[in-house]
Amino acid sequence: QTGQAVQASFGYYIFPLVAIIFGYIFKGERFSKIQIFAILCAVCSIVTLGFALRLVPTFSLIIAVTFGAYGLIKSFTKLSSLESVTVETMVLAPVAFSFLFFNYSLQGQENYTAIRPDFWLLMVSGLITGGPLILFAFATKNISYATVGILQYINPTLQFLVATFIFLEPFNTWHAFALIFIWIGIIIYSGESWRLELRR
C-alpha cells in the first residue's frame, strides 16, 4: 500500500541468509564446504537482484532481520507450534482489529457492513496465514535453522513466478541470473544436507 512491494519481496530473499547467519551465531550450527558454496550462491543471487532493482534495500533489511529474529525466538520456545501461534494471535488480534476499524473510521466508513471488500479480505487473511505460521514454528523446532533459511527461498520464488506469469510484471536477464543462483544454492544445500543425514 506504500509503493514498497519490490523492497518487501527483496526482503524475503534476504531473510534466508539472515536465518543462516543467526543459526551460525546463536545456535552453533556449522556447515560443510559444499553447504558454504550453496550459501555463497544465495549471496550471489541477492547481489544480482540488488543490481537489477537498483535500490538500497533499507526496508528489505528491516523485514529480513525482524523475521529472522522472530524465527530464532520461535526455535527456542517450549510451546508447541499450535500453542505459540495461538498466543501470538491472541496478543496481536485486538491491535490489528483496532487499527482496521480506526483506519476505516477516519475514511468516514462507520457502517462496517458497507465497507468495501478489501476490509473483509484483510480480516480473513489472518486465518489463511495461520497455517503457514504453524508449520514454520514446527520447522524451527525440528530441523536446523540454517535449513529453515535455505528453504525459505521457495516462497519468494513462487511469488516471483506469479508476478511474472500471472501479473505480467517485467522479467529481465538480471532476474533470470538471480533465480538460477538461488536454485543452484537450494539444490546443492538440500542434497548435501540429505547426504550428511544419511551418514549419521
How would you describe each model-predicted region?
Residues 1, 14-34, 157-176:
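C-terminal transmembrane-helix exit sites in multi-pass transporters
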Residues 9-14, 81-91, 130-165:
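Helix-helix packing/entry segments at the starts of transmembrane helices
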Residues 16-21, 68, 97, 126, ...:
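Hydrophobic/small/kink-forming positions within alpha-helical transmembrane segments
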Residues 34-50, 63, 174-193:
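Hydrophobic transmembrane alpha-helices of multi-pass small-molecule transport proteins
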Residues 42-55, 93-117, 164-168, 189-193:
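Membrane-interface helix-cap regions at the ends of transmembrane helices
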Residues 50-108, 200:
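Transmembrane alpha-helical segments that form core, pore/gating elements
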Residues 62-69, 73, 106-147, 187-188:
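Hydrophobic alpha-helical transmembrane segments of multi-pass membrane transport proteins
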Residues 153, 157-200:
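C-terminal-most transmembrane helix of multi-pass membrane proteins
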